[in-house]
Amino acid sequence: MLQTLKTYFGYDSFRPLQEDIIRHLIDRKDALVLMPTGGGKSICYQLPALLSEGTAVVVSPLISLMKDQVETLCANGIAAGALNSNNDETENASLRRACMEGKLKLLYISPEKLLAEANYLLRDMHISLFAIDEAHCISQWGHDFRPEYTQMGILHQLFPQVPIIALTATADKITREDIIKQLHLNQPRIFISSFDRPNLSLTVKRGYQQKEKSKAILDFIARHPGESGIIYCMSRSKTETVAQMLQKQGIKSAVYHAGLSPARRDEAQDDFINDRVQVVCATIAFGMGIDKSNVRWVIHYNLPKSIESFYQEIGRAGRDGMPSDTLLFYSLADLILLTKFATDSGQQSINLEKLQRMQQYAEADICRRCILLSYFGENTTCDCGNCDVCKNPPERFDGTIIVQKALSAIARSEQQIGTGILVDILRGNMSSEVTERGYHRLKTFGAGREVPARDWHDYLLQMLQLGYFEIAYNENNHLKITQSGTDVLFGRARALLVTIRREEAVQATRGRKRKATVPTKELPLGLPNTESGELFEALRTLRKRLADQEALPAYIVLSDKVLHLLSASRPTTIEEFGNISGIGEYKKKKYGKEFVELIRKYS
């Protein structure tokens, strides 16, 4: 088993749970696997496929994901193919023939195609196992429900002797139970890996408005020169706006959302995978089909609807285990809009509860990683040291006067205003709505002029969290003072607020050289950083040339992590090259000579 792992995937050992899952599947038993993005889920069914007679059938929701997986497998010397509507009939006929002749080890197929072929092709194949990727799509409780997945419950009925492995990166308890029920899994063993992704830094910015977000995003990207990233937006129009803003600053960007034609979406994804653009501005429609290992950062322009969605989306960064950054912007406007969506949905109570948990993460004053892990049933008591709360623990001050000014303005407007007008009143802005409704004559008009608008939005989020007012979602989102708020307003209680730090994000990362960063334990001692950086760039150039020759994404030839290991250890023989983690026998023979020749020039 270890020899097969090394030969095809280039690894000397398994990650946690992988070996147990593989043995369980080889014993022809059903399994449900929960493992974070980048945690090594694919090997859990790919290795059993190589060790078993016949062909493994892998159900995948997106053609782009199939394409990426098949290219990666073929680049490792493994016979794999994808049966889908993007192929012409000649290609699909050839694939069917290869399956029936037992020449393919893995066949990727969509749920729709699987059902169409169930009584034809699949009956004529020797199937080693079924792997259901992105299995949360089968559950109505999952964050990405797809009706076509629900019909896959017939697999056990049609092929009772074939084991099924269902895999997902995010599923809470109710979703896990639903996956097992829908797929009719037979006494499955549930494998739950740690959801911790310690290489991802976690940062939240509250109360930023559009101009401030734009500046913060540009500053953030400036600290990641040339590094790939994704910006998730709530609306299609916002993806266009943000992409235009980036392009004006000379940052190559693409847009991806469901309103584009399939050809435009494919082009954006292809440009991103092949490093022709640095940034994709996308709605949540983007990313499930992305196996790009060197995405270095993810920004959420708006609050996501649930922790599951958020976790899966930030998981697209740092899949190779290298340090990567995530940034979430959070505003009251997001909360109001998402609450409306949840209220209008068919599962109001569940969706509101999920939104509330996401809100708790965004407003946390304790370790954010602890909150994420707790949501998925993992308990940890120690601080992570890699989130904004741990790096800069919040300090509190007596904010009673600030709170009283805001609550007084709400009261004097007869609790008939939302947050936007409230900030205008406090700041003394003569907006048309303020003057039309006579709010410029209120005693509190301009009472908070000394506090910047961004800080007011932050304080209002804190006040909402502290329970000083509520949002009447059924009354045009007007703010209503609670009993706790009344106590502060009339001086019966004090209000402690978190001090707002004015420095822009990333003082915490100042001085941290991110280029050519490798986990310390993998770096040989005494390696000159400048020389290592020069070699790394030369290796990247060679990798790009080889990838272009084969029309492959560069990371499929060799990952960034492998390049860092090569620049650190500098193998000068093909045998030493093959000993690097992540380089299997096939890649050693195919690429070893050219990479070793280049490395020798720097040795």
Model feature map: region roles:
Residues 1, 350-352, 381-603:
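Accessory DNA-binding and partner-docking regions appended to nucleic-acid-acting proteins
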Residues 1-8, 12-16, 20-42, 50-52, ...:
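Helicase motor core with emphasis on the C-terminal RecA-like subdomain
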Residues 25, 221, 272, 362, ...:
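Short helix-to-turn junction characteristic of helix-turn-helix DNA-binding domains
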Residues 160, 225, 365, 415, ...:
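Flexible coil/turn residues that form the inter-helical turn or adjacent wing/linker of helix-turn-helix
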Residues 347-376:
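Short, charged low-complexity linear segments at domain edges
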